[in-house]
Design a protein with these regions (language model features):
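Cystatin/cathelin-like cysteine-protease inhibitor module
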Residues: 1-153
Length: 153
């Protein structure tokens, strides 16, 4: 569903369950994290039920959940590339018009220091005119979707 629809669903759910409106953002983050890190076939009602169970046990527990919309929104629906990393790669290339995306993979680390490692493999022309294949890895802030740093391969 579109982001606005998801926000409306969460607001309606929170109201229906009698949860304070001030907790709506935490519920949204919980729903975002679960739906992005679990099975694609999950139903929002089930996921929000899990969030509600967590909330009933400890209302503060949802404060650790992360809204992954910014991170998720930076992936291209066309080729799966991670746009902020692709932009940095092209900016550092000899001939950015030779850039050809091959693949992008990511690994989420959702601990006390939540971030993602995003790796993009691409082809491009080097300074000598030869086509080379390279992989660049970056540490990404999952809250903002921005690249924090390029990692050594």
């Amino acid at each position: 569903e579109p982001k606005e629809t998801r926000h409306d669903i969460v607001k309606g759910y929170v109201g229906f369950k009698g949860v304070p409106v001030s907790s709506a953002d935490a519920f949204y983050a919980c729903m975002s994290e679960y739906t992005f890190t679990k099975d694609d076939a999950l139903k929002l009602g089930d996921v929000l039920g899990w969030c509600f169970n967590d909330f009933e046990k400890d209302p503060q527990s949802l404060n650790n959940k992360i809204n992954l919309d910014a991170f998720q929104g930076n992936f291209s629906g066309w080729d799966g590339s991670y746009r902020p990393l692709e932009k940095l790669i092209k900016a550092s290339m000899n001939d950015d018009s030779s850039y050809k995306h091959v693949s992008t993979v990511y690994h989420l680390i959702l601990n006390k220091d939540p971030h993602a490692v995003v790796k993009t493999t691409f082809r491009g022309t080097n300074a000598y005119g030869g086509v080379v294949k390279q992989t660049v890895a970056a540490r990404v802030n999952v809250r903002t979707g921005e690249v924090d740093s390029i990692l050594d391969n």
